[in-house]
């Protein structure tokens, strides 16, 4: 099954997450099909906290991709 979930990046104590479209059998930070956005939980000031390519996200959802609970909440917050 194709899922849209977060993949952790960044460095120690400074997390940064990519919103990835991936096969659910792949590792969390492993192979992915497409990157559709990012989430920066440590953003301050004018830094961008979240960016989502809504057009591509909708494309994958229409084709049956399932969003994780956290991604669903982030997409609602960014809208």
Curated annotation (Swiss-Prot):
InterPro entries: Ribosomal_bS16, Ribosomal_bS16_dom_sf
Any one Gene Ontology molecular-function term assigned to this protein's record: structural constituent of ribosome
UniProt superkingdom: Bacteria
GO biological process: translation
GO cellular component: cytoplasm; small ribosomal subunit
Keywords of the record: Ribonucleoprotein, Ribosomal protein
NCBIfam families reported in the protein's UniProt record: S16
Family: Belongs to the bacterial ribosomal protein bS16 family.
HAMAP family found in the cross-reference section: Ribosomal_bS16
Protein name in UniProt: Small ribosomal subunit protein bS16
Record organism: Hahella chejuensis (strain KCTC 2396)
């Amino acid at each position: 099954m194709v899922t849209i979930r977060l993949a952790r990046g960044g460095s120690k104590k400074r997390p940064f997450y990519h919103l990835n479209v991936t096969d659910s059998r792949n590792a969390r930070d492993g192979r992915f099909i497409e990157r559709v956005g990012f989430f920066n939980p440590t953003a301050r000031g004018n830094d961008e906290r979240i960016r989502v390519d809504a057009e591509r996200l909708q494309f994958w959802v229409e084709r049956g991709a399932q969003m994780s609970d956290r991604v669903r909440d982030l997409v609602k917050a960014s809208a």
